[in-house]
Amino acid sequence: MDKVKIDITILAPVEKVWDYFNAPKHITKWNFAHESWFCPSSENDLKVGGKFNNRMEAKDGSFGFDFIGVYDEVILNERIKYHMEDGREVEVIFEKIDENTTKVTEIFDPEKQNSVEMQREGWYAILNNFHKYVENH
């Protein structure tokens, strides 16, 4: 199955975008696809071989899961690569456009349960939440 690629341009310096993308105190504020969900906890050991765990839960308590991965590559303010527990790979690229503009690109292996379009929409919704959070904080 082909990798899925999404991107968004954020009006903020790359250093801020990197920090807000990786710091657990920020991750819990933006890491959900819909307002009926939230991210109550986040742990992030941002180094090669380090692990992250973002807890995702429906606000009504009906469902929840841990989004877990292990870092394969970390280049400060430029790139992150990780793999999830099921072996799928994700790459996140932070591209400095200018002093106050950053393009974030996510490239990921889709899972087989849901349609590629549904996955693209879900991942993009989270990336868009991130975009709004960074520009408003």
Where are these regions (language model features)?
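Glycine-rich portal/gate segments that line the openings of hydrophobic small-molecule binding cavities
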Residues: 38-82
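Generic structural detector for well-ordered beta-strands
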Residues: 5-11, 45, 55, 70, ...
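Hydrophobic ligand-binding cavity/cleft-lining segments
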Residues: 1-38
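Short, surface-exposed coil-to-beta transition loops
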Residues: 5, 64-68, 87-91
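Hydrophobic pocket/interface hotspot
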Residues: 17-18, 27, 52-54, 71, ...
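Beta-strand/loop substructures that line and gate deep hydrophobic ligand-binding cavities in soluble
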Residues: 79-125, 130
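Short amphipathic alpha-helical signal-transduction/dimerization elements
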Residues: 22, 127-135
